[in-house]
Regions:
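Catalytic Walker B motif of ABC-type/P-loop ATPase nucleotide-binding domains
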Residues: 107-111
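Conserved ABC transporter NBD signature motif
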Residues: 15-29
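ABC ATPase "signature
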Residues: 166-167
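Conserved ABC ATPase "signature" region
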Residues: 53, 57, 63-78
Length: 182
């Protein structure tokens, strides 16, 4: 979670460097990245469509993307439904939709299935796989190994800012290195 905050310029790093897209200036790079770092924050009494309209206006991008985004996240048929009528999985999919406004190349998600019931977890995992098949790079922070195995192609295991292990998921899971996760 801390790493995601740093790479999104929400938190300042106390050491180290990184760059996006071959060293693109940070403000330009940030426009290519969609993110969901916390619990979705929408107006309960507004429709999915109106909530995305507000989000697009605040971000100053993606206003014309609303229909497409709602189709991408499987909520187009419910675009006029109030947010308060959505299941937890639908709320999370709408939040991912908000992160997709403006057509980012990269999507950063912090614990995207946290607090969801099994049906919601399945919905979000399927959405993540679908978005990746569309060419969107997705970076996920998760403490759930099962989630990582089911939706990720590569994994990096960090402890207190230090990289312990990284590589393709299958290779890391077969590794002889023993990692104790607490």
């Amino acid at each position: 979670t801390t790493l995601l905050g740093i790479i999104l310029n929400v938190l300042l790093a106390d050491r180290g460097t990184y760059s996006w897209f071959g060293g693109m200036p940070p403000d330009d790079a940030r426009r290519q990245i969609g993110s969901l770092l916390e619990t979705p924050n929408f107006y309960h009494y507004l429709s999915a469509y109106n909530n995305l309209e507000i989000t697009a206006a605040i971000r100053r991008r993606g206003l014309t993307d609303r229909d497409n985004v709602l189709k991408q996240v499987g909520l187009y048929e419910r675009k006029d439904s109030k947010f308060q009528t959505f299941s937890l999985g639908m709320k999370q999919r709408l939040a991912i939709g908000a992160a997709l406004l403006g057509g980012p190349k990269v999507l950063v998600l912090d614990e995207p299935t946290n607090g969801l019931d099994p049906a919601g977890i399945t919905e979000v995992r399927e959405l993540i796989r679908s978005l990746n098949k569309q060419g969107i790079t997705i970076i996920i922070a998760s403490h759930l190994l099962d989630e990582v195995e089911k939706v990720c192609t590569h994994v990096a295991i960090l402890k207190k800012g230090e990289l312990l292990l990284n590589g393709p998921v299958e290779k890391v899971l077969r590794s002889q290195d023993i990692i104790e996760v607490r």
